[in-house]
């Protein structure tokens, strides 16, 4: 799991972080990080929408569906 890191090692590291920084700072850090990720995703989505609008071409594909009547 994760390159040899067990769940117990992760829990110990988390407990040490809580002791050092406190839950309030970790909560603020988590919300700030989440806001940054959300802002990044929105910026990427806006860029891809702008690019799609410039190069969007509609394609129509006509095809016939053939049914295979082979039974096993």
UniProtKB/Swiss-Prot annotation:
It comes from the Bacteria. The chain crosses the membrane at residues 1-21. Keywords: Cell inner membrane, Cell membrane, Membrane, Protein transport, Translocation, Transmembrane, Transmembrane helix, Transport. It is a single-pass membrane protein. Pfam families: TatA_B_E. GO terms for molecular function: protein transmembrane transporter activity. GO terms for cellular component: TAT protein transport complex. It is found in: Cell inner membrane. GO terms for biological process: protein transport by the Tat complex. InterPro entries: TatA/B/E (IPR003369), TatA/E (IPR006312). Belongs to the TatA/E family. The Tat system comprises two distinct complexes: a TatABC complex, containing multiple copies of TatA, TatB and TatC subunits, and a separate TatA complex, containing only TatA subunits. Substrates initially bind to the TatABC complex, which probably triggers association of the separate TatA complex to form the active translocon. Part of the twin-arginine translocation (Tat) system that transports large folded proteins containing a characteristic twin-arginine motif in their signal peptide across membranes. TatA could form the protein-conducting channel of the Tat system. PANTHER family: SEC-INDEPENDENT PROTEIN TRANSLOCASE PROTEIN TATA. HAMAP family: TatA_E. This is Sec-independent protein translocase protein TatA. It comes from Marinomonas sp. (strain MWYL1).
């Amino acid at each position: 799991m994760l390159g040899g890191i067990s769940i117990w090692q992760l829990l110990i590291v988390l407990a040490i972080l809580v002791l050092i920084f406190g839950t309030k700072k970790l909560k603020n850090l988590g919300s700030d990080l989440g806001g940054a990720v959300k802002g990044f995703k929105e910026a990427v989505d806006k860029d891809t929408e702008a690019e799609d609008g410039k190069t969007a071409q509609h394609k129509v594909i006509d095809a016939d569906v053939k049914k295979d009547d082979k039974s096993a």
